[in-house]
Amino acid sequence: MTNNESKGPFEGLLVIDMTHVLNGPFGTQLLCNMGARVIKVEPPGHGDDTRTFGPYVDGQSLYYSFINHGKESVVLDLKNDHDKSIFINMLKQADVLAENFRPGTMEKLGFSWETLQEINPRLIYASSSGFGHTGPLKDAPAYDTIIQAMSGIMMETGYPDAPPVRVGTSLADLCGGVYLFSGIVSALYGREKSQRGAHVDIAMFDATLSFLEHGLMAYIATGKSPQRLGNRHPYMAPFDVFNTQDKPITICCGNDKLFSALCQALELTELVNDPRFSSNILRVQNQAILKQYIERTLKTQAAEVWLARIHEVGVPVAPLLSVAEAIKLPQTQARNMLIEAGGIMMPGNPIKISGCADPHVMPGAATLDQHGEQIRQEFSS
């Protein structure tokens, strides 16, 4: 960080983080990345469940570390009067309280939204749960796969002749985490005008449903749920994964101009004037035969040749990379998307803001109650 750079736009912000597992900690990690002081309040015992999740490096859980590095850790038993008083003092000074318990848990602990407002009228109280704090499913337990199953996203993921599959990453958790971050940021901005706090209520179900895009559009337009399409796009073609002589590549043509350029690169210019392929709508209708024409040509040479040739004419094209290959890309390095936190390689901050530091090294994830003595002393009165 240079002398002219800040730690981030949230430098000086105090966040009390009661979130656990993935959904909530992902959202508060974004706040931490942007300069906020995040104090993770963990229960007695083993703390956040993910401390016990693999994989491990040097005895540390990577699962926990990926979404909790740079945060402080204190263990508080909120059923204990002394610990509860420390927690209340923390709340009095905090800007944000984040949690992802089932609805009703904070009330049982004595910290309803009404009580929190009395303690600190400017507090942003952010809740994230499977189905939110309202509606008939609000008390239902949820993990990522439950939400993927119920939101419709699993039913539209995969191939038409195969069963539905879970999206490869924990999409519902991560969608919820991103919206948790966005909700907190929005509420903080609103506080600048109102001078009062707010309750942010995020549901993983809502978040995932809002990401459905094609699925929702198709249903609204036709009254029917869409079929699974594999790697194809419902409204654009060619927009798929194609086999070459040695490796698959992905090609995306979103308009007639790109399709014409692709045909030029593949020396298939006769396809441009073929009435079956003269528009996106027609190419989608006839994409099976179109894919045969394209793959027949692609299979004559190696992927490397086609990647260069197609890229040269300005058509979006890419190899299918493994994680190991993706993290070694010069682009990954140039964007500082791999950093070191506590001696362990971690994902970098995807939010780049001018004038704010984008460090290559961050503090690692704290051990359980690592900052307990310091925090108890700081907030003892």
Swiss-Prot record:
Annotated keywords: Transferase
A Pfam family assignment: CoA_transf_3
Any one GO molecular function term: protein homodimerization activity
EC number: 2.8.3.19
Coiled coil, from the record: none
Induction: By the acid response regulator EvgA.
Catalytic activity: oxalate + acetyl-CoA = oxalyl-CoA + acetate
InterPro entries: CoA-transferase_III_domain, CoA-Trfase_fam_III, CoA-Trfase_III_dom3_sf, CoA-Trfase_III_dom_1_sf
Residues annotated as the enzyme's active site: H233
Cited NCBIfam families: PRK11430.1 (NF008511)
Function field: Involved in the catabolism of oxalate and in the adapatation to low pH. ACOCT serves to prime the oxalate-induced acid tolerance response (ATR) cycle by producing substrate for oxalyl-CoA decarboxylase (OXC) and formyl-coenzyme A transferase (FCOCT). Catalyzes the reversible conversion of acetyl-CoA and oxalate to oxalyl-CoA and acetate. It can also use formyl-CoA and oxalate to produce oxalyl-CoA and formate with significantly reduced specific activity.
Record note on quaternary structure: Homodimer.
Family: Belongs to the CoA-transferase III family.
Protein name: Acetyl-CoA:oxalate CoA-transferase
Organism the protein comes from: Escherichia coli (strain K12)
